[in-house]
A protein has these predicted regions:
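Acidic, glycine-rich catalytic/binding loops that coordinate metals and/or anionic ligands
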Residues: 1, 84-86, 110-187
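Short glycine/threonine/proline-enriched tight-turn/helix- or strand-capping micro-motif at secondary-structure
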Residues: 2-38
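Serine endopeptidase catalytic core focused on the charge-relay Asp
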Residues: 13-19, 92-93, 113-119
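Short helix/strand-bridging catalytic loops that position acidic/His residues to coordinate divalent metals
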Residues: 22-25, 73-82, 102-104, 136-142
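Zn2+-dependent peptidoglycan hydrolase active-site motif and core
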Residues: 31-33, 39-82, 110, 114-116
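A structural signal for short beta-strand/turn segments enriched in small hydrophobics and glycine
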Residues: 42-44, 85-100
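Short glycine-rich beta-strand segments
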Residues: 63-65, 99, 120-122
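Extended amphipathic alpha-helical segments with heptad-repeat/coiled-coil character used for oligomerization
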Residues: 105-109
Length: 187
């Protein structure tokens, strides 16, 4: 399905860096009526409450500071973000973050409402410098928490192993994955 992680779109030519979870229930007007919960405890590092500012729509990013290296989870296309949450807020596991929705900087039909969920690593602490060198015509409104600066891992196998406590650090988990490519860099 196109909601899975990996090369699942456009006949395998487009990479989907997260997992799309569809609603279990809808209200009388057909809107998704599911709460979105945090997968792990963490701290809110980014909160975008303006749909048009991102293809992710309304979204937030948690840093899971008890993990080494820290991982990030991203919750996108939210209809709303729970009142009282702000950057720096600590979040418990299974805490309500918001409502599932269809927000984005483009149109997602109501019947395609979903949660776009990612788990991954942040590439750099100096993303803005990289962004400024590119020919983008829009402002980076998300600092180091732009989707371009987060690299996802497949959430399903990671979270399954995390729940079983089958690794002691995310690095141990990442090292257990098969090598996808090897590069030789010459200067």
């Amino acid at each position: 399905s196109s909601g899975a992680f990996g090369c699942v779109r456009n006949n395998g030519f487009k990479f989907h860096e997260g997992l799309d979870l569809y609603p279990v229930k809808r209200d009388g007007r057909g809107r998704a009526d599911d709460n979105v919960f945090s997968a792990m405890e963490g701290v809110i590092r980014h909160l975008n409450a303006t749909s048009g500012y991102s293809a992710y729509g309304k979204y937030l990013v948690l840093e899971h500071t008890t993990l080494n290296p820290p991982l990030y989870s991203l919750y996108a296309h939210l209809a709303s973000i729970e009142d009282g949450l702000k950057v720096g807020s600590s979040v418990r596991v299974a805490q309500v973050l918001g409502k599932m929705g269809n927000t984005a900087s483009y149109r997602i039909p109501l019947d395609r409402s979903h949660l776009h969920f990612e788990i991954g690593l942040r590439l750099t602490d100096d993303f803005q410098r990289w962004y400024d060198k590119k020919p983008y015509t829009t402002k980076n409104r998300h600092g180091n928490f732009s989707g371009f600066n987060l690299v996802g891992i497949d959430p399903l196998p990671f979270y399954s192993e995390y729940q079983k406590k089958s690794f002691s650090t995310p690095l141990e988990y990442l090292r257990s994955l098969p090598v996808a490519a090897k590069l030789r860099v010459r200067s």
